[in-house]
Every structure is written in C-alpha cells, then in structure tokens.
Amino acid sequence: MEVIRDGEGESVKYKPGGRLDMSHGFLRHIRRNQIARDDYDREVKQAKEKQRRRHTNTPRRPRRPDRQVYNPRIRNGSEPGVNAEAEDWNESSSGTEMENTGTELFWLDYQADNGKITSFIVHKEDKPEVIVQRVAEKNVLDSSMRAALLARVGQEMNKRCDKR
C-alpha cells in the first residue's frame, strides 16, 4: 500500500485498491524452492516404497548352514606338488592341537614379558596341568608363574564347564 501525504503532512490518505508490490519476484523463488522440495520428498518416498516391495519368497541366506562334507585327498601320483604341499601342511601343525577336537571352552592367550603372545584353544576334556605344560614349552615360566597359571586356567575351565 502506498501512503499519500498532503503538503503539510497532517492528513494521511491511502491509495485505493492497495496491494502488495510483487514485482521484485522474491516469492516466486520461495515457491520454486517449495515445489522442488516437494518433488524431492516424493521421489525419496517412492524409492523407499520400491525398496520395501522387493521382498522375495526365497530367504537371503539358507536357514541351516551348509553341512561340512569330507573330501578325501586324491593319492594318485599324477600331481606330486599338490600332495607334497598338503603333507607338509599336516606335518607342520602340532599333534597336540589335532588330538583335542572336543568341545571348545575358550582361547587362552598368554603374553610373555617380551610381548610374544602364545595362543591355545582350551577344550572341555583338557587338564589344566597339560595346558600349563604346553604354555611352558613355548615360554620361560618359573614355578610361581606356573602355579598362578594353573590356578587361573583351572578357575576359568570350572567356570565355563558349569555353564555348559
């Protein structure tokens, strides 16, 4: 609205049919931004619905894990390199680890003073004395350390055997 003043400034008159001057175009930019925002929101909503509708009848992964199947080694002499590598691998692993295939209770990680870490899997059927002996073979342990390790391993085994 425009205000018209008289020369003296006492009487104030309003221009008839007063409206906002929209020639600056400011609201046009606001409306354009609102329309762009609405279009974007609509696209995002449609994408989410499309993603929700993609459910298939088959599950993504099998309900039961695949069974492990024993595949025997082929012992024909045609591939000596492959068989030799497999035999070397079997020889390099220690026999004590292969003997104990019972119920696994926990991993035993022993860190020596020099920072070397020795790891063993402790099984339900293992005896704490045997485990301490295996750790002592790979690390230098005095009698007090052996006794402390024996007590701790026995305590952990009893705690985990009671839970199972």
Swiss-Prot record:
Disulphide linkage map: none
Residue stretches spanning the membrane: none
InterPro entries, per database record: UPF0561
Top-level taxon in the UniProt lineage: Eukaryota
Residue ranges with Basic and acidic residues bias: 1-13, 35-49
Biased composition (Basic residues): 50-64
Chain segments carrying region Disordered: 1-98
A Pfam family hit: UPF0561
UniProt similarity note: Belongs to the UPF0561 family.
Protein name: UPF0561 protein C2orf68 homolog
Originating organism: Danio rerio (Zebrafish)
